[in-house]
């Protein structure tokens, strides 16, 4: 892990929407592709910053969705197709023609949409604790009810009390994670939920040729392991990696194990090398 590797933040206006963007630059010239990262619902950039710090030999770019973190509220609703287009334009702006794409939970759906919509610029795909959208196996009802409650972002005591129910296998660094969260606006959170209403990638995934790593937690209360197995069945060139005692936030609770799997997958020579256009 690099010492002092800090992101550069900027406010970028793309297609009439202003977004807070963060870019971590590689600490050394490695020739490795940048990572485009899509975060979970309601989660600001800082929520997953520790993971970006651990992958220090690649550029890493992510952004707050409208009304989330430091991005202003959306004026009108958006959908996954529109947001994938905005991500595509952001990569043009930051001169990243070919990337590896990664998404967690809600962001995993965005990562699928981006890969399906902009396949020519996606080298490899990593889907973490996510599903095929509308066609998913639901999680623990107790966790889903609490997840829908906006107090999980606004009230630290509520989050601390229900952390185990919400996220499963997270046993340490709970307070640290809670302190990194910034509550989304009500509009931002609602529009982010609305963006995926009725969305599913299932009919299209059998045509996705991108080399894909699917990572799931065996103790995930929100997106059960069965969803990862379904994705693995649908995507032709995929592999499934399971952290048996990992909850929904296993990227943080099992950081070393998770990062090792991610790095091994990304550094592995592709079956067919792809060159940036």
What feature does the model see in each segment?
Residues 221-227:
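Conserved alpha/beta-hydrolase "acid-adjacent" motif
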Residues 17-70:
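Conserved HGGG/HGGXW glycine-rich cap/lid loop of the alpha/beta-hydrolase fold
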Residues 136, 156-206:
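Conserved alpha/beta-hydrolase catalytic His-Asp/Glu region
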Residues 208, 214-216, 220:
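Short beta-strand/loop motif that positions the catalytic acidic residue
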Residues 112, 116, 123-152:
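Flexible "cap/lid" loop of the alpha/beta hydrolase fold
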Residues 62-102:
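Active-site loop/oxyanion-hole signature of alpha/beta-hydrolase fold enzymes
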Residues 103, 107, 111:
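Gly/Ala-rich beta-loop-alpha elbow adjacent to hydrolase catalytic centers
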Residues 246-259:
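Catalytic histidine-centered segment of alpha/beta-hydrolase-like enzymes
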């Amino acid at each position: 892990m690099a010492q002092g590797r800090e992101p550069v933040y900027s406010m970028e206006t793309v297609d009439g929407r202003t977004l807070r963007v963060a870019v971590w630059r590689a600490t050394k010239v490695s020739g490795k592709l940048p990572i485009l990262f899509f975060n979970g619902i309601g989660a600001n950039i800082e929520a997953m910053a520790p993971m970006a710090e651990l992958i220090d030999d690649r550029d890493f770019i992510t952004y707050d969705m409208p009304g989330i973190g430091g991005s202003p509220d959306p004026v009108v609703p958006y959908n996954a197709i529109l947001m994938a287009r905005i991500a595509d334009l952001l990569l043009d702006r930051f001169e990243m023609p070919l990337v590896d794409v990664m998404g967690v939970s809600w962001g995993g759906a965005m990562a699928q949409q981006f890969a399906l919509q902009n396949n020519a610029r996606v080298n490899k795909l990593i889907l973490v604790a996510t599903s095929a959208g509308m066609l998913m196996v639901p999680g623990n009802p107790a966790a889903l009810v609490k997840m829908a409650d906006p107090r999980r972002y606004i009230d630290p005591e509520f989050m601390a009390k229900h952390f185990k129910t919400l996220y499963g296998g997270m046993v340490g660094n709970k307070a640290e994670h809670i302190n990194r969260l910034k509550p989304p606006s009500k509009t931002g959170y609602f529009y982010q939920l609305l963006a995926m209403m009725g969305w599913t990638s299932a009919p299209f995934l059998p045509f996705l040729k991108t080399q894909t790593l699917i990572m799931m937690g065996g103790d995930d209360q929100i997106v059960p392991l069965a969803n990862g197995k379904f994705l693995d069945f649908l995507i032709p060139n995929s592999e499934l990696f399971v952290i048996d005692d990992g909850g929904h936030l296993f990227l943080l609770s099992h950081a070393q194990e998770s990062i090792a799997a991610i790095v091994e997958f990304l550094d592995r020579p592709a079956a067919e090398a792809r060159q940036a256009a």
